[in-house]
């Protein structure tokens, strides 16, 4: 789920959604808060709001350990989490940068994330909902060193280990695919950034936006997440969100 011009000062774990080629420095921490309102909202019922605080701590040998606590709020309740208005999850995660070449602008990372519901599991029409799954990924990044504002590109595979097909892939049948990212500095403090998970599933979004470096080791990102199934069934899903977040390294 970052500005290339600030990589010497920051080492964020994601661009918007996909893992970046960075890891937080050993002994440092990174906190982020994401806010995503569904836009446009559904024709009937309440729109969804996503709140996601994230904490990452840098470990030895270019590793990092983190935890996300995303919560999806929808007035009127959600059958997938026992009709609660808020579906909460916890996502411990780990990332390792196993290769880097600063002179060539190259890095390779791999990682894993465990997605587990906090509201407990339930069954709807005999089908288990709100299951636990694991995300595994790899990512290659290349910084193109042309002038002061060369871009950085990211690409790699991902796969999800999930025992229940109907849960993770509720809008499709894709349990893996590719991740792509692009970070283009526009000035010393502003960059255009975009990332994409392929597939019609929980992660399947394209998100372009702007990243702004702030004083005090802070960062603000604003973008728009477009679900890969967004216009399916005559636009019935409206699977699109404004994506806002603030992050700070400490």
Residues covered by each model-derived region:
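C-terminal segment of classical bacterial N-terminal signal peptides
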Residues: 2-9
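Transmembrane beta-barrel domains of Gram-negative outer membranes and organellar outer membranes
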Residues: 10-164, 168, 183-191, 195-197, ...
């Amino acid at each position: 789920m970052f500005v290339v011009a600030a990589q010497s000062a920051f080492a964020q774990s994601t661009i918007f959604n996909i893992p970046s080629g960075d890891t937080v420095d050993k002994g440092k921490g990174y906190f982020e808060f994401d806010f995503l309102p569904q836009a446009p909202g559904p024709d009937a019922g309440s729109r969804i709001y996503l709140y996601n605080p994230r904490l990452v701590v840098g470990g030895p040998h270019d590793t990092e350990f983190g935890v996300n606590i995303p919560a999806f709020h929808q007035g009127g309740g959600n059958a997938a989490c026992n009709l609660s208005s808020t579906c909460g999850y916890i996502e411990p995660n780990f990332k390792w940068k196993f290769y880097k070449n600063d002179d060539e602008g190259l890095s390779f990372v791999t990682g894993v994330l465990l997605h587990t519901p906090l509201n407990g599991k339930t069954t709807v029409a005999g089908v288990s909902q709100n299951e636990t799954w694991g995300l595994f990924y790899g990512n290659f990044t290349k910084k193109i060193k042309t002038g002061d504002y060369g871009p950085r590109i990211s690409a790699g595979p991902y796969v999800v280990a999930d025992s229940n097909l109907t849960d993770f892939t509720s809008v499709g049948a894709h349990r893996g695919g590719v991740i792509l990212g692009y970070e283009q500095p526009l000035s010393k403090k502003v960059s255009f950034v975009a990332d994409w998970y392929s597939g019609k599933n929980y992660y399947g979004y394209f998100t372009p936006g702007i990243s702004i470096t702030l004083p005090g080791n802070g960062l603000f990102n604003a973008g728009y997440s477009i679900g890969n199934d967004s216009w399916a069934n005559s636009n019935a899903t409206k699977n699109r969100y404004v994506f806002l977040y603030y992050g700070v390294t400490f």
